[in-house]
Amino acid sequence: MARIAGINIPDHKHTVIALTGIFGIGRTRARAICAATSVAEDAKIKELSEAQIDTLREAVAEYTVEGDLRREVSMNIKRLMDLGCYRGIRHRRSLPLRGQRTKTNARTRKGPRKPIRK
């Protein structure tokens, strides 16, 4: 297994699909990385040479991925909550942020129903 950005990449998958296993890299960015490093998208990871894997590592290192990206996202959410803006308040209350209805739906965000006290 090749190790890129601290993640073990599966050998049996195609390069584009294997790169999407890294948090912060989707299909589009994986294709762009393959094009920039001139690695075939349909080549499997086990077929790549060590030099090609090194170029993939360097290309992925240019992006914010994995732990740094997770930390950045959580800090952005924390900043919104500290500001006390509408989105921050919705995060704090675990409600939908983008105008969805909450009278009947939003069970995923709100959690399980609480029993009604009589």
Swiss-Prot record:
GO molecular function, one term: structural constituent of ribosome
Residue ranges of the region described as Disordered: 94-118
Pfam families: Ribosomal_S13 (PF00416)
This protein's UniProt keywords: Ribonucleoprotein, Ribosomal protein, RNA-binding, rRNA-binding, tRNA-binding
UniProt GO BP: translation
InterPro entries the UniProt entry points to: Rbsml_uS13_C, Ribosomal_uS13, Ribosomal_uS13-like_H2TH, Ribosomal_uS13_bac-type, Ribosomal_uS13_CS
Top-rank taxon, per record: Bacteria
Entry keyword 4Fe-4S: no
GO cellular component terms attached to this protein's record: cytosol; small ribosomal subunit
The family this protein is said to belong to: Belongs to the universal ribosomal protein uS13 family.
Protein task: Located at the top of the head of the 30S subunit, it contacts several helices of the 16S rRNA. In the 70S ribosome it contacts the 23S rRNA (bridge B1a) and protein L5 of the 50S subunit (bridge B1b), connecting the 2 subunits; these bridges are implicated in subunit movement. Contacts the tRNAs in the A and P-sites.
Subunit structure of this chain's protein: Part of the 30S ribosomal subunit. Forms a loose heterodimer with protein S19. Forms two bridges to the 50S subunit in the 70S ribosome.
PANTHER family, alphabetized: 30S RIBOSOMAL PROTEIN S13/40S RIBOSOMAL PROTEIN S18, SMALL RIBOSOMAL SUBUNIT PROTEIN US13M
Protein name: Small ribosomal subunit protein uS13
Organism expressing this protein natively: Shewanella woodyi (strain ATCC 51908 / MS32)
